[in-house]
């Protein structure tokens, strides 16, 4: 995998390509940038997986998370809005990931709004309304659970599916996990996240 990066207004400094290996964030490549030189980072990759682009290894909040895959990937951003306004091209899995993230963000924003409302109601002791808000939160959680489950089962050829399964269903019962596994293609099951998911299932 080759990652070509353009960071507007970034004149000088290090830029790092990172990933998670054995639960630890590691640097897989880095380059010292000066005088508007091309930024090219590389990594060996067997199947699509999450990578991170970072300007400061001590600050995990200001990094770009993306799905890497074989081939050439281009990332365009700026120093001022490094991880909040960027464009990624060349990774079909990342395009799918962006769409998924946008849906989950809507769930999270709705949940935060309801939690804030519940705090406000608690201050004025509106207990009946608090119960209604909690019911809405429970309903939202259920809808998100079902969305994730439906997504994974309906997109068995997507390399994103086993990652969602790992993050959202690791604690689920064997029936749910078997259903998820049976929906995945052999290619996906043999990917990095597919193998991790399969190990979770074997330990049930």
Description of each model-found segment:
Residues 1-81:
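Start-of-domain marker
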Residues 44-50, 54-192:
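Preference for long, solvent-exposed alpha-helical segments and helix-linker "stalks"
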Residues 170-171, 194-204:
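TPR/TPR-like alpha-solenoid helical repeat scaffolds
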């Amino acid at each position: 995998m080759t990652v070509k990066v353009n960071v507007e207004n970034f004149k000088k400094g290090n830029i790092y390509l990172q990933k998670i290996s054995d639960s630890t964030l590691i640097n897989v490549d880095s380059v010292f940038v000066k005088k508007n030189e091309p930024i090219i980072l590389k990594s060996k990759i067997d199947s699509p997986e999450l990578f991170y682009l970072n300007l400061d290894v001590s600050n995990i909040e200001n990094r770009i998370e993306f799905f890497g895959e074989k081939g050439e990937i281009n990332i365009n951003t700026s120093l001022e809005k490094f991880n909040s306004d960027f464009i990624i091209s060349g990774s079909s899995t990342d395009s799918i990931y962006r769409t998924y993230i946008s849906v989950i963000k809507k769930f999270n924003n709705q949940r935060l709004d309801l939690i804030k409302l519940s705090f406000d109601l608690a201050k004025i002791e509106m207990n009946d309304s608090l119960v209604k808000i909690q019911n809405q939160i429970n309903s939202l959680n259920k809808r998100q659970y079902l969305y994730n489950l439906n997504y994974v089962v309906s997109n068995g050829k997507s390399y994103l599916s086993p990652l969602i399964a790992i993050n959202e269903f690791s604690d689920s019962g064997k029936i749910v996990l078997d259903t998820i596994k049976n929906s995945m293609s052999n290619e996906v099951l043999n990917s990095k996240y597919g193998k991790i998911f399969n190990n979770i299932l074997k330990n049930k």
